[in-house]
């Protein structure tokens, strides 16, 4: 340290402006009023103590977080001057604390170099604190003064200081009126910065204590070796190329330069930390530019002197030479010029030349005296150069391939429509289910009666044709939905072949999801022979079937009701839901093209019966009503033979039976039955005479029934036998009733509660829920019996039902009676159509191009092979500004590889191409970034955490500017959905789940759904919880402690196992992403 010879007094405190603006616009001075700005207050006070250390007057700084949340900073420097300031007429201490930009650096007398400035930072701290107390030990006295919200309380007090020590103590409590998010300091955030300062100022001891009741800890940071020890700390878990750290320090034109360097064998990127006046310059600056230039020039010069590079060889690039380098450069500049208010880039042009000169001389000398180290560094740089050339060739190959495919973006990127990077965001997700799907010749079942391949769908979409598919709606019923965005998603994809129990085969990617019978999804590669798949069944109507009155129309099986529905009625519902038209009573559905198999919603219109019949009459004049056809029919109907046949037919028992059956079938038709019931109800409600007559008739009937002695006797006998078989029951009932209901208030309360609970709606919902439970369990068991026996063996089912003792499995006759109106054929049909099964899954050796479509709202569709599959390509996003990039599996661990292998990796190729960036040197241009929010969105499991770490490693090592400039985010999807009654809550941690449950009554009923992966969420859930900017939670990634971040990436992603195991065992169980300040 260099000590100044001038005195440090009040006349060296220069006043520039007042303090009033600080409280009005605190963000201009400390960056924000959040956690970052709060901790900046501490840094400003500590920087003042560091200034004393830089000037050579301070060796020990003590920082304490006090029990009341305030902070105290003590140094053993000279102490803030206390004599009267010539300009303000107040003490220098009061001037320093109350006047903005009153500091010891201005005017040049107090400090030779300075980061934080006495009076510049501390006055801001004073303005933004509820109170500040300052003690100064100087000139044999202890001086004290208190300030509140920037205003002095009283005058400077002085008492004798027997010890004649010197120094300054500043205590402050941040103002909650300014820091509305809280004033709690984070120990680790402060410790990280203080440790960094101790490395940068060799020989200065920094003591940091936390005196809060729940913490009580203390650390000391003292590094005699300064930045040399800093480099040693960062390379602890790496393998050094040379044991001795290359170190130099020097001074020129009052600029002090200190550099420490070490190359490592097992690192493929560089970590260079730059500091100017103890301030981390994350955006670089002239000092780092000078260091990089001198490293490149010096190493190339040494390489040629030692014949490592021949005359015809090109120079090694700066990236080649710096591969594997860990270094720290710290400069102390008398008049620093920082670009931007955050002081993150040094702008002094003279510093570049000074660094170049001082480091060049020292580095050349070191390498000349250590030829083995020189050779090792150059050899690693040469290998890096060769790898870069291989990477360049691989990169060019990727570019040429993209040009040949007429696309510069990866095929599986589901891009957004916006071209404005500032509003665009990309979600990097797991799995190919968001990209590749089916072979191009796979057929999709369409509602126009066709089965069309994915390739044909792409072509028809280009031609402007709108197609519609079958889908399972959110309530489990069959529906139709439009198809959009038919496209090829990936080339040369690995696929598997799935064979169904109906003999159909499907070629798809291994992780594409199939819909199970219960509405959930499962990846193709995970399907088993026991899985029950959601089926698609279609048939053509015939009047020979019970209740069917029209021939030749398509019908589709609805899994929710286990019944056949006319497809045109399902499409009609879609039109009404979309508001295409409003359904009115007694309207008819009409196929525009007169093709009753084309059930596309846009082929349907609704007409009044009169218009519909008129349209058909108009059309029929060209078919059945041609004159020749009419005349032929007339002659037939008038013939005696025809009349005899019709008469005989009407009188035959078979015809009478048919007519009777048709009449009964009408009453099995739910629509007909509902119409008749509504008609009767309308008649009943509007006919008071009939209601009175009906009531009298019912009353007369029950009187007549109970007037007969045998009826009264029979009922009395039933009651008598019941109590005879249970002798103690009468007394027990009596006693219980007396105990329970002798309190009138209790009786009144119970009556009220019962009335509230057992509403008609509640009774109906309870009945439906029980009915569905019995229905689903019985149907599934019957289907299993059919599969195991090859046919529906009722006796086998009864044996199974009895053996399980499951009361919810109904007898087959009861099942038919309750749900199928005693029609066994209908029940057997429901069992037959219940599901599909897998019979085989096998790998396919060749790779193929794969395709996908997008299905809005429901995100599933039916294949012509008879099963429903998931459309997961772009669920739950806003296509205007949100893009999705799926990555298959875990990307390459770049911590263990070189550039050539990185560029050959398919997933990294897709990533860097989608972002619009290269990864190093001239290739990397941050201005070309296509999205200003790059969001890592992985599952909440071990694999998801690993993939997230691999991606963060890649960005940190190879696209560091994305991290430094705040473009990288981590999505925080919920872990649980908690449902109670009609309300639901999303919980993002176990703690949040337990807190929510604790708010329920002790006997509350609730259900918990654990989201193991994003694929388990419905699209709307994913949007509401994770992707909607209005409601989501995302963590922005930034680096506070660069050295610690570098070390952690090395530990977690490097080759050495022992440090990684120790780290995971120490911290693994403590990590909660939702609490993590990333």
From Swiss-Prot:
Sequence ranges assigned to domain Toprim in this UniProt record: 889-974
GO molecular function, one term: DNA binding
Binding site for Mg(2+) 1: 895, 939
Post-translational modification: This protein undergoes a protein self splicing that involves a post-translational excision of the intervening region (intein) followed by peptide ligation.
Gene3D superfamilies per the UniProt record, alphabetical: 3.30.230.10, 3.40.50.670, Hedgehog/Intein (Hint) domain (2.170.16.10), Histidine kinase-like ATPase, C-terminal domain (3.30.565.10)
Cofactor note: Binds two Mg(2+) per subunit.
Source species, domain of life: Bacteria
Co-factor requirement: Mg(2+)
Compartment(s) of residence: Cytoplasm
Transmembrane segments: none
Binding residue positions for Mg(2+) 2: 939, 941
Cellular component annotations (GO), alphabetically ordered: chromosome; cytoplasm
Keywords, sorted A to Z: ATP-binding, Cytoplasm, DNA-binding, Isomerase, Magnesium, Metal-binding, Nucleotide-binding, Topoisomerase
EC number, as in UniProt: 5.6.2.2
Class of the enzyme per the UniProt entry, highest EC level: isomerase
Family per record: Belongs to the type II topoisomerase GyrB family.
Subunit structure: Heterotetramer, composed of two GyrA and two GyrB chains. In the heterotetramer, GyrA contains the active site tyrosine that forms a transient covalent intermediate with DNA, while GyrB binds cofactors and catalyzes ATP hydrolysis.
Protein name: DNA gyrase subunit B
Species annotation: Synechocystis sp. (strain ATCC 27184 / PCC 6803 / Kazusa)
Lineage, broadest ranks: Bacteria, Bacillati, Cyanobacteriota, Cyanophyceae, Synechococcales
Gene, per the UniProt record: gyrB
